[in-house]
């Protein structure tokens, strides 16, 4: 048994001197494995007298249990040390500044739409929407646009068939609103519209906001005051505004609205072509035929309507000189509007 005590002492010393889990595993195999030294001692029991075997076997089992207990404790200690070292190597310095998440922002067209809608809802207008795939009647006939009008040609309008098309303006929403509601009516109609045109200042798809007010005793002075106040609030400055006589089939009288150039304050520049004025929208008093076809008596009610291109207003407000930049999805451009 002296040899057993010496073997146990040797095993315990080896366990305590192990510097890592792999070395500890080799020690376990060397002493406790199938061919380990303590296992081999157990196999020598067959050489002892029968009366000595139980006592010696018990001593060997106690020795193996002691070595196993110390080995497991050393293994736990080494694993804990390894984990602590790994955590220390991977630790995060919470005092360092974090990486900020890149935040998005509203598209300049969306910002412009919201700005327009905010003004008109503030003065009592509602928001009305309608289908982008429209029928010929609501897009043209109900708006007093005759069959020979150039806007009805395939060069300007995207047709699906003889009767269905992509709306060329949001005016059909006004017609549908008048058909479904009795005056007084106060609405703006924002939305996408489509025309067969594409260059530096035109896009086949663009956004438009049209407005309509129908009530008793509405006159051109009401229209003029509304538009002048809108432009003042939208551009956040006092601007000279003029109304030029024009023609639209759905309004009579009709006018084009020009405002003082926001780039040069009316002095003349490349943007306004040295005129000092910028065209911003069309407007007029709703034509009696349009009211009549919508089921409203033009002898009792009158109204005004106006329409503006959202991209046009956004270009002027933000100083953008190419319409196509709004649709290129270039984050370097869009990031300016956050």
UniProtKB/Swiss-Prot annotation:
Cofactor info, note text: Binds 2 magnesium ions per tetramer.
InterPro entries on file: aa-tRNA-synth_II, aa-tRNA-synth_II/BPL/LPL, Phe-tRNA-synth_IIc_asu, Phe-tRNA_ligase_II_N, Phe_tRNA_ligase_alpha1_bac, Phenylalanyl-tRNA_Synthase, tRNA-bd_arm
Q: Which residues form a coiled coil?
A: none
Q: Which GO terms describe its molecular function?
A: ATP binding; magnesium ion binding; phenylalanine-tRNA ligase activity; tRNA binding
The cellular location(s) given in this protein's UniProt record come to:
Cytoplasm
Q: What is this enzyme's catalytic activity, as reactions?
A: tRNA(Phe) + L-phenylalanine + ATP = L-phenylalanyl-tRNA(Phe) + AMP + diphosphate + H(+)
Detail which positions bind Mg(2+). 252
Signal peptide extent: none
Q: Name one GO biological process term.
A: phenylalanyl-tRNA aminoacylation
Q: Which GO terms describe its cellular component?
A: cytoplasm
Which family is it part of?
Answer: Belongs to the class-II aminoacyl-tRNA synthetase family. Phe-tRNA synthetase alpha subunit type 1 subfamily.
Q: Which PANTHER family match?
A: PHENYLALANINE--TRNA LIGASE, MITOCHONDRIAL (PTHR11538:SF41), PHENYLALANYL-TRNA SYNTHETASE (PTHR11538)
Q: How does it assemble?
A: Tetramer of two alpha and two beta subunits.
Record-given protein name: Phenylalanine--tRNA ligase alpha subunit
Lineage of producing organism: Bacteria, Pseudomonadati, Pseudomonadota, Gammaproteobacteria, Pseudomonadales
* Gene that this sequence comes from: pheS
